[in-house]
């Protein structure tokens, strides 16, 4: 008898989903300490049960395919398959569910974030049974975390290298981000560092354009660093962006920065790729360079609430791949960032052991097994009036970057840097004395203005500047 073949467009799709549930939905499964765990926010297509979708996610991101194949009998699928072991509805949302999937550790190459992401956030995100899918969190087990080098140096080693303790670090992105000549760029770097900043920074899209080739920029910036260090007696740095069209060119630029003796370089880890970033992090560990990481392109991936990858996952990926700094949002500036959610992934970047806390978006307890921490970078639309909130939110182990908030000072770059340095030290001193910066931060800034005309001028310029938009990224 010849079997009947269904030719309707949806028939094969339905059959495939039903097959997944039989094998990959296992609510009785006991999670192992070595499993990599994922929390997915699923929006099923109309009429598709969440159990079928959860099973499809587990299957398509591990061993499954759309039909039964004879080679299944040549291996142990029970050993290697992903398993959807729990599904819960999302409160306040229609037809959205959190699916928890456990993956055996043997599915992934040791020390490879690229391989991890290729499986977990690969083809499954285009699966027809799902209207939308978002990876909310990952649990990296100690057995897998220990296969990674992680950040080249970490927070404490960075402080030892630059000899700065007891306060947050201050930075500034040079503006305009594009169009300056190398010499004028170096001049702006020098003025900001001399004025009191710890770091200045290339913008993420500064690479090697016709108006400013990378080697010229590196040379003038190195001169600015050495001159400002000689005049202030402090160790200074500039995040030289080594991101390039090829990995070979990237490493060439990193080596030039090392030869010039600068302390830190920069990389755009999402646009350049995780493999390139891991190679660069290993190089920085070997040569003593600090590595600043920019997250350009992240909002394309993480901003929508129901589809993509949450930034806490991208932050975990960076901690595995390697970076000493990572931009993390500000809560109070011009860029997206809700307070509790931001603090949740900031803790995942800095701390060694983080407890599960759904109120902050942390779905799993994470043990980093002494992997070095990543310093969060707050940047984007911040100025001196934001300083109390930034100190209260981020504490000391953070880099606060004021681009326009430094270079937009009416008296120039160096006074802008001085205003930020005075504001930071005033807020830090007040906090250490027991002042509640959330309630009395404005009074602290106003009091400091009496002793700093640069700060007073900055406060006058930016007293009315606010970015009061409702955040999209909510729990």
Swiss-Prot record:
PROSITE patterns: RUBISCO_LARGE. The keyword Zinc does not apply. It catalyses: 2 (2R)-3-phosphoglycerate + 2 H(+) = D-ribulose 1,5-bisphosphate + CO2 + H2O; D-ribulose 1,5-bisphosphate + O2 = 2-phosphoglycolate + (2R)-3-phosphoglycerate + 2 H(+). InterPro entries: RuBisCO, RuBisCo_large_chain_AS, RuBisCO_lsu_C, RuBisCO_lsu_C_sf, RuBisCO_lsu_fd_N, RuBisCO_lsu_N_sf, RuBisCO_lsuI. Binds 1 Mg(2+) ion per subunit. HAMAP family: RuBisCO_L_type1 (MF_01338). NCBIfam families: PRK04208.1. Heterohexadecamer of 8 large chains and 8 small chains. This is Ribulose bisphosphate carboxylase large chain. It comes from Stigeoclonium helveticum (Green alga).
